[in-house]
Amino acid sequence: MLEKNPVISVKNLNKEIGNHRILNDISFSVCSGEILGIIGHSGSGKSTLLRCLDFLISPTSGSISIAGFHNSSAKEKISRSDFAKRVAYISQNGGLFLAKTVFENIAYPLKIRYPEMTKSLIEEKVNEALHFLNLYERKHAYPSRLSGGQKQKAAIAIAIVSDPQVLLCDEITSALDPRSTEDITDKLLQLNEERGITQVFVSHEIEVIKKLCTHTLVMHQGNIEELGPADKLFLNPYSSITEELFHMNSIAKGIYDHNENEEILRLGFPKGLAVQGMISQLIQGGQISINILSGDINLFRKIPLGFLIIVLSGEKKLRDRAKDILIGKGVIVQKFQKSR
């Protein structure tokens, strides 16, 4: 996420409300075409950070640069209309006008931001967005007649009709059923891959983060706990908070009483290794045994990544040899400490 001129740059950002610090010395950057997922427990500061990026609230200190706009500029010099042409914010509730049809809702920002735009061009752009989101047949419907997924698609159409550089998405799939969530994330991924739209996505749904994000920022109590490529954080997390959020150690911790000739390992299989069988190679000869506690193959932006939690049994030198073989093949090997 290092680039001389990133689309988003945040440096030493702090936000305090009264005596309570919501954000503490936050620094990161997002390059063109990346999707950054922000995850963390409730109250960790995720949505506050996103609202700071959209200039909806002002930080106590620190700097934000996004799509050429800077929070250090005088507020009166930043036109909200100009800002919204480049940066679109999508909330959980969608923010549709109840008295306007889907078509009218999508056309409204174009009329406000581009008063010189012809009626025919507005209609062309709105219809293009409607077709992209598979909403054309609902263009004359009012929000009260839409499903939750359709409302959120309409909100995305409103966001993209002005061709923004950046999309800021705040828990936009949290109230949707699995099918609607899949439809929405497919469209967001398509926007990224085909149009190169940079995105920041706040979510507590880890499967959504896996599917969409190139990078993940883990927050805890207003601090950045961990930051890096999404697949690397999944396979080799540094922080226990990241482990917990990715649900990787719930089975192993505290449920297996192992002895001195056993150890619990987490094996991470990067792309290209997730579908290769290696375990059978290790147990040939019968000198060690492997008990699989859990495992899964996950798709990160369509790339398969796998992990296993195993109990490796045998003499220490044989276990060490087995681990060396795995590491030599590119497997990430981590040892669980026995729970107390």
Swiss-Prot record:
Recorded topology in the membrane: Peripheral membrane protein
UniProt GO MF annotations: ABC-type D-methionine transporter activity; ATP binding; ATP hydrolysis activity
Main location per the UniProt record: membrane
Protein residues bound to ATP: 40-47
Presence of the UniProt keyword Iron-sulfur in the record: no
Places the protein is found: Cell inner membrane
Catalytic reactions on record: L-methionine(out) + ATP + H2O = L-methionine(in) + ADP + phosphate + H(+); D-methionine(out) + ATP + H2O = D-methionine(in) + ADP + phosphate + H(+)
Pfam families: ABC_tran, NIL
GO cellular component: plasma membrane
EC nos: 7.4.2.11
Start and end residues of each ABC transporter domain: 8-246
Cystine bridges: none
Keywords: Amino-acid transport, ATP-binding, Cell inner membrane, Cell membrane, Membrane, Nucleotide-binding, Translocase, Transport
Domain of life, per lineage: Bacteria
Function: Part of the ABC transporter complex MetNIQ involved in methionine import. Responsible for energy coupling to the transport system.
Binding partners and assembly: The complex is composed of two ATP-binding proteins (MetN), two transmembrane proteins (MetI) and a solute-binding protein (MetQ).
Sequence similarity: Belongs to the ABC transporter superfamily. Methionine importer (TC 3.A.1.24) family.
Protein's name according to its UniProt entry: Methionine import ATP-binding protein MetN
Origin species: Chlamydia felis (strain Fe/C-56)
Name of encoding gene: metN
